Amino acid sequence: LPEQDFMRF
C-alpha cells in the first residue's frame, strides 16, 4: 500500500 494510505487514518 502507498505511504499516503496510512496517513488517511
Swiss-Prot record:
Q: Which residues carry this modification: Phenylalanine amide?
A: 9
- What is the documented function of this protein? FMRFamides and FMRFamide-like peptides are neuropeptides.
Enumerate the subcellular locations listed in this protein's record, separating them with semicolons.
Secreted
Q: Where in the body, by tissue, does this protein show up?
A: Expressed in the CNS and thoracic perisympathetic organs (tPSO) but not in the ring gland, midgut or abdominal perisympathetic organs (aPSO) (at protein level).
Give the residues annotated as coiled coil: none
Keywords of the record: Amidation, Neuropeptide, Secreted
Per the similarity annotation, which family is this?
Belongs to the FARP (FMRFamide related peptide) family.
Name the principal localization, coarsely classed: secreted
Q: Where is the signal peptide?
A: none
Task: Report the protein name in the record.
Answer: FMRFamide-like neuropeptide LPEQDFMRF-amide
CC terms in the record's Gene Ontology section: extracellular region
Record GO biological process: neuropeptide signaling pathway
Q: List the disulfide bonds.
A: none
The lineage is: Eukaryota, Metazoa, Ecdysozoa, Arthropoda, Hexapoda
